[in-house]
């Protein structure tokens, strides 16, 4: 058991599970003959959540219900309630369609691929990754900006299927039920409204190439990747049942939507606010296929993405929740990292708010939180392995704003700023 740090050891209480003393934890809860600390309670809750996740209530076809999918998304993704509901229903219907595919031959159910529209750092990639984890299917990501048409320098679209196959450990059957997330699809928009007589190999050409695998084709994939050779053997992968989720920031799309809406609503029910007075996310919710066509996506590509979910910018409160609330929250990750050095990391509420403000100013959303945390904690992470007796490191608002250094609290209860400050 851990010994008490000061005071009469006879009067010191210890957690019956981890052995930490009352001085080392925030709260110690007493039972008839045992004690449990707040850290062990939190660990127990995590274990129970993990168990619940693996035993999701499934409908008769063996697919988790939309409500259960959404509940697990809530554990990892903060906010974006509308997008989570849209995705939960779409994913449930997709895998329910696969479960019933062989049973009902009278009505053919078409596949509904998904388009995610939202600013950088709003959670598009995380949503797609979490969905694949919930359904327990292979998952891969691709960057649309690196893709080119077959025969040109760059990455062939069929390489996406190869990556999915690798994620499935070359199990073709599993790969054919996987999820593919294609990021930055807004960057492959057509360069102008009029079809060009010259080849647009990284824009419209990529959209045309993606069409084939999105609507369903048998892709010939070289097992080792790379260029195809006539002599080598290929793996045949049917993409008909692969769920494609495309995502992008679509900067400027809100102006196209706002322009379409001008003059269409009059009278007492009209929304007379200027477009910039409304949140971008609210405007994006009104997106129509014609807006995506004007943005530069070709009609066939838009037609392959019938389900559209929009995400909004994250405000201060949402970013603070992202820092602290999810199971794998950034603050929890860094606290665990410091625990490995037997040091407690304390971050004040005002400091968290300042971190959120910085991320908003940088326009990086949740994606920028880690780089901010890294820069704040760089000195403590550099110093700690060579220091003795440090019990806690405190980060306050002044530290985040660069007006002060992190505070080091030692086991003899003395405090000092970071060495070398």
UniProtKB/Swiss-Prot annotation:
Binding annotation for Zn(2+): 15, 18, 37, 40
Sorted UniProt keywords: ATP-binding, Chaperone, Metal-binding, Nucleotide-binding, Zinc
Record flagged with keyword Zinc: yes
Annotated Gene Ontology cellular component terms: HslUV protease complex
Gene Ontology terms describing biological process: cell division; proteolysis involved in protein catabolic process
Domain ClpX-type ZB, residue spans: 3-56
GO molecular function: ATP binding; ATP hydrolysis activity; ATP-dependent protein folding chaperone; protein dimerization activity; unfolded protein binding; zinc ion binding
The keyword ATP-binding appears for this protein: yes
Pfam families: AAA_2, ClpB_D2-small, zf-C4_ClpX
Source superkingdom: Bacteria
Residues annotated as binding ATP: 119-126
Function of the protein: ATP-dependent specificity component of the Clp protease. It directs the protease to specific substrates. Can perform chaperone functions in the absence of ClpP.
Recorded family membership: Belongs to the ClpX chaperone family.
Record text on subunit structure and interactions: Component of the ClpX-ClpP complex. Forms a hexameric ring that, in the presence of ATP, binds to fourteen ClpP subunits assembled into a disk-like structure with a central cavity, resembling the structure of eukaryotic proteasomes.
Name of the protein this chain belongs to: ATP-dependent Clp protease ATP-binding subunit ClpX
Native species: Rhodospirillum centenum (strain ATCC 51521 / SW)
